[in-house]
């Protein structure tokens, strides 16, 4: 065979262990395993190419106890370790070596580790099992239950046993180790001069080669040339009887599937009453294929996917609906293996978004079909998570621009970038940096496989929030600490290798450290929030008993105005679902409106403050911390940390790319550069979250605590500096603050930047305060929730109101509530009086009572989650205080006392009545013969029926059914009016610190509605003689 020069854009890397036979003599042979690496990519012409790589190895790192002299005992230790190696070809001295590395955790000097290399993943797992004495990290009980062999820990010289050795790098993917060894990107152009073309090539890709993995290198000449990627989008149409378990019902059916390819070709596969499967030409770019049975339709889709040979497959909500329906129907029709075969190398497999391909999959857990050579993407998941700021969400745009850049930056294969989120990206990035700096990658320091509960987590205070000053504020400027958490890491040298507890032993001197000290008070009597909350409780609830037991509901006419937060005697069991049709809540509001005695303004303001403080105490999750915390941080002059180095590279590269993008040039190139800088920003901001995640892959709570404490210090000092200059600070939150500007400023932009520069001069480099926005008018509703009108740089004022958080961005409110809320907000920003605001509310309610509001404006939507099979219960892990709290699918219910003896049909009816009203409506619709709603959201109206009870389930109805039966069903106008109280009261509380404005506005309407209901009852109730 002749050697060829090969250049490909690699986007998918796959590793597997292959069994092989080893011939020792002519009459003796044995079996062993070796790793094969398959790389999928496209060449310069866009043709799909697969490269089979050999000579692949994987390795792990062994850490011995600090008090064990591994250097003295090395020869005997190596002998024992080699005896534990499974594959005979791996039992060589070069595969078991002693290396000197700096530990990742703690301020420590270099120490000796042992690096063990393997030619197969199977051999690596077997070695771990023999050394540690566990079955792949499982317990002895698990091994017995599964019929596995129990291995005792190995014994080493001088009393060392295998369970005392920490083994790192077990979960580092082999493909990542190969990429780092060769220093090539997981998604980009690579080349080799020693490729051999395979004699036999599968029809699923154009070219196939073999090559030694060590001959590949990064191709710099193709760095700026975008690849030609052929992609496809797909969608299914199906009849579903139960949206909670799509595709599982015997009468469910997929009747149509559509495919759109990036080259302009479209395909439509459908069921139809034809005698043969003829191909119908719709137009020159669309093919329609008709099938007689659902099974043939699914097989036709699988065959089409293999024939197209695309590099990526995209869908909308495909991981929660399309994939689940497709696999459920294929499983019922006994063609699951053929349907899974959608890639360039069979077979495909079902995988979750966490990368798990084994074990039971939850009813509501996103899944995808993992196929070699074809990246599976769900654009809806992109929209909901990482890519919410992208200007468009087409597959071609995301895969070619953003995902590629994120994969290159974080050293992560393309499919992991999308499916396994930031934890995996930071993990891969840290592994890459540790390898470069000869630092031991200690990913097994805290047994990250263990699930950390709330009781295991050591609490610490979160970010600082300065409560907003009530009212509409004119001429406000916002200052923001640019990339605060990443720059804090750099400024204070915060890292795994530098931050330690104050009392920890270290080989460094005390003068080599900087001490970070702060007070942490969470849920204790020293916390100002708790102190103020308890004082307000005594004022608002004077009848509380000495033992602090909760008081019962106050009678009508007494107590505070807003009783949304008062305890209920009949508290609902369902805790994980926002039920927008809660009749108890409506009754609470109605009682508040109709009470004869309203509290004073002082009581209202005390109540507003009480609600805010109660929400913050609830956010503490019952944690109690009362102590002075101290940490020591190694100075950067002594030893720079690895995290500051990583973050600094990301920020410097982002700044460089932004400077290049600011120069006028090709729009396509500018779009590419913009997504590159966005990828750097997201990655830098993710590092703080990775250190603080309790169940994370590389946790370091000391680093997270230090970052948060220093962040509070920075924003407090910045607020104080502005106040010392006589500039009022209206609101502050985490990394930003809003200051009051003078009306006579000629250039507010220059003034605000000058203020930011002055505050910056007191901060450590590279921290910087920048001016973010100049605001004409702003109303703060709470944390991360405000409404504003921005000031333009030409001196004008934006006509559009910007909503951040709150009702305007929520889907579960009706259009009537949203539009009324918006009209009230616009009236407030127009500086109308309090009485005029009441008039706006009254007029909108009057329109509703006169039936001048369109039905579509009254429609509400709520998400319907899974209820499983309707009767099987599981213990609720989140609500351990309630013994009678059980999980029915994704909902929490009370278990029937005779659950084990009653029939399944009775239990289904019993538990269905406990579920939210919109869930009951969804099942009612399916009983009427209507298909379930794709996407899991049901639309409904609030209605009232003659003689119906006040149960919420009987008082909501689907729109079409309402229109067909409007003569006997009426709109429940009072419900929609009462739904205005909460959101608009929140706005009025922020402006006037009063809670009775909406109540006063709707009180005549509520009284009128009550009279109408009484008249209808008297007129239409039959007389019994």
Curated annotation (Swiss-Prot):
It catalyses: DNA(n) + a 2'-deoxyribonucleoside 5'-triphosphate = DNA(n+1) + diphosphate. Keywords: DNA replication, DNA-binding, DNA-directed DNA polymerase, Nucleotidyltransferase, Transferase, Viral DNA replication. PROSITE patterns: DNA_POLYMERASE_B. InterPro entries: DNA-dir_DNA_pol_B, DNA-dir_DNA_pol_B_CS, DNA-dir_DNA_pol_B_exonuc, DNA-dir_DNA_pol_B_multi_dom, DNA/RNA_pol_sf, DNA_pol_B_thumb, DNA_pol_palm_dom_sf, DNA_pol_type-B. Gene3D superfamilies: DNA polymerase family B, C-terminal domain, Helix hairpin bin, Palm domain of DNA polymerase, Ribonuclease H-like superfamily/Ribonuclease H. Its EC number is 2.7.7.7. It holds the Pfam family DNA_pol_B_exo1. One of its GO terms (molecular function) is DNA binding. SMART domains: POLBc. GO terms for biological process: DNA replication; viral DNA genome replication. SUPFAM superfamilies: DNA/RNA polymerases, Ribonuclease H-like. The keyword Nucleotidyltransferase applies. Replicates the viral genome. Host DNA polymerases cannot substitute for the viral enzyme in this process. Belongs to the DNA polymerase type-B family. This is DNA polymerase. It comes from Trichoplusia ni ascovirus 2c.
